[in-house]
A protein has these predicted regions:
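Sec-dependent bacterial lipoprotein signal peptides
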Residues: 1-21
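Cross-family detector of peptidyl-prolyl cis-trans isomerase
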Residues: 2-3, 21-173
């Protein structure tokens, strides 16, 4: 008899407790701390200097002024002015590594072919501001990445940190 009374109580508890233990809830509000950490990281990179010189150049695309990508060139862009710059519809060949703010590698490729306007908007802004043979680190805010819902194993509100080398452009369209 006592078991008959306990079973409904245990069932009700399991319905409320188990889902929170399984971690399957992708509600963006569950990521408020991660969002703050990512925003703080982006803000700190935006003002990072060495000897008073900004380490990242803010790039705000003319076609969308709602976000800014922070870019650090690992080569001297002034020595590469004769190289071509891709358009948003060009076919580009790049090497890249994608990490998050804690250094976890999320994706990488030694040979990736892409059309910039088929990528997240922050990647498109970065690649269309590069020239062939440029190597950059591009810090992309979540608003120009995978947004408030994330993508695959990338959580919502993730600042994307791309290491990109633009190897070539096969179709400049």
């Amino acid at each position: 008899m006592k078991l008959n009374r306990i079973f409904p109580i245990l069932t009700a508890c399991a319905l409320f407790i188990l889902p929170s233990c399984l971690g399957g809830n992708e509600n963006p509000s569950d990521y408020s701390e991660w969002r703050v950490l990512n925003q703080n990281y982006y803000d700190s990179i935006e003002i990072a200097t060495i000897d008073g010189i900004l380490q990242y150049i803010p790039i705000t695309p003319v076609w969308d002024n709602s976000f800014t990508v922070l870019m650090h060139w690992h080569n001297d862009p002034e020595e590469n002015t004769s190289a071509i710059t891709p358009l948003s519809t060009s076919t580009c060949h790049v090497k890249y590594t994608l990490t998050n703010i804690v250094g976890d590698t999320l994706d990488s490729s030694d040979s990736f072919q892409c059309v910039p306007n088929n990528m997240v908007t922050g990647f498109m802004a970065a690649i269309t501001n590069m020239r062939v043979n440029d190597t950059v680190t591009a810090v992309i805010p979540y608003t120009a990445g995978y947004g408030a819902y994330g993508y695959s194993s990338i959580p919502p509100y993730t600042t994307l940190i791309f290491g990109i080398r633009l190897d070539s452009i096969s179709k400049l369209m």
